[in-house]
Design a protein with these regions (language model features):
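Serine/threonine-rich, low-complexity intrinsically disordered segments
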Residues: 9, 52, 101, 117-120
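Ankyrin repeat domain, specifically the short helix-to-loop turn at the C-terminus of the second helix
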Residues: 16-25, 59-76, 101-113
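Ankyrin-repeat boundary/"N-cap" motif
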Residues: 1-3, 27-48, 74-90, 113-120
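Ankyrin-repeat intra-repeat helix-capping/turn positions
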Residues: 10, 52-56, 95
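Long, mid-chain structured domain cores
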Residues: 87, 96-99
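Ankyrin-repeat-protein effector appendages
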Residues: 2-5, 106
């Protein structure tokens, strides 16, 4: 998938041109939530958040989030309830506090502390 290729290779310019694939991915994982496919490695947001280059990760993350927020409107928070956990796992593993600070607002305190104790 072109989206994963852009994320893995840190191609921010390409990611910005893949809005339709970002939304397809967000829709897919949202619709599939709770069907046993909750492995965080299946989420693009995880692969963005775990990048070693924290500045690039934040730029890619903001591109991903802004695309979703613009297109999803009132449904954005419902989607973030599904996307936040795998994104937090990646951000905690990579120590990207900027992404952690944004994503932890979408999960309850117990879920956040579970991620920190498990992956930190």
């Amino acid at each position: 998938m072109e989206l994963q290729h852009a994320i893995i290779h840190g191609d921010l310019d390409r990611l910005r041109k893949l809005e339709h694939q970002i939304l397809e991915h967000a829709n897919h994982v949202y619709e599939d939530a709770g069907n046993g496919n909750d492995n965080y490695e299946n989420f693009s947001i995880y692969w963005i958040a775990i990048k070693e280059d924290k500045e690039l990760a934040l730029e890619m993350f903001m591109t991903f989030i802004n695309t979703c927020q613009t297109a999803l409107g009132n449904f954005f928070h419902a989607y973030m309830e599904v996307l936040a956990y795998p994104g937090l796992v990646g951000a905690v593993c990579s120590g990207n506090e900027a992404i952690v600070d944004i994503l932890k607002t979408f999960v309850d305190e117990d879920a956040y502390m579970d991620i920190v104790s498990t992956y930190n």
